[in-house]
């Protein structure tokens, strides 16, 4: 009996990152972020080898990554954290998953109780 040689179709995966919250405050540049992703995404073990496999687009406050190659949300989170650390924003902004393949950059919540405790210590 002949082996099954049918190939699986390439699945196109779309990941979206909503960067509206930090962009409105003027601390985040979506164009710079999308350029960073283009420059640092690895395809087949090589940086800058996007070709037709991965497309990064920026539309206002939404950055979209469309991939027909292997690309995970964890890798996008890793690259985003590296970008935030490089631009010294990691202490104020975090990368949060909203739904499957949809992410958002939000500010850390500072509770008023923490601020009161700091004032009491002094």
UniProtKB/Swiss-Prot annotation:
Its main location: cytoplasm. The keyword Ribonucleoprotein applies. It holds the Pfam family Ribosomal_L22e. Gene3D superfamilies: 3.30.1360.210. GO terms for cellular component: cytosol; cytosolic large ribosomal subunit. One of its GO terms (molecular function) is RNA binding. Keywords: Cytoplasm, Ribonucleoprotein, Ribosomal protein. The keyword ATP-binding does not apply. It is found in: Cytoplasm. GO terms for biological process: cytoplasmic translation. Belongs to the eukaryotic ribosomal protein eL22 family. Component of the ribosome, a large ribonucleoprotein complex responsible for the synthesis of proteins in the cell. The small ribosomal subunit (SSU) binds messenger RNAs (mRNAs) and translates the encoded message by selecting cognate aminoacyl-transfer RNA (tRNA) molecules. The large subunit (LSU) contains the ribosomal catalytic site termed the peptidyl transferase center (PTC), which catalyzes the formation of peptide bonds, thereby polymerizing the amino acids delivered by tRNAs into a polypeptide chain. Component of the large ribosomal subunit (LSU). Mature yeast ribosomes consist of a small (40S) and a large (60S) subunit. The 40S small subunit contains 1 molecule of ribosomal RNA (18S rRNA) and 33 different proteins (encoded by 57 genes). The large 60S subunit contains 3 rRNA molecules (25S, 5.8S and 5S rRNA) and 46 different proteins (encoded by 81 genes). Present with 74700 molecules/cell in log phase SD medium. There are 2 genes for eL22 in yeast. This is Large ribosomal subunit protein eL22B. The gene is RPL22B.
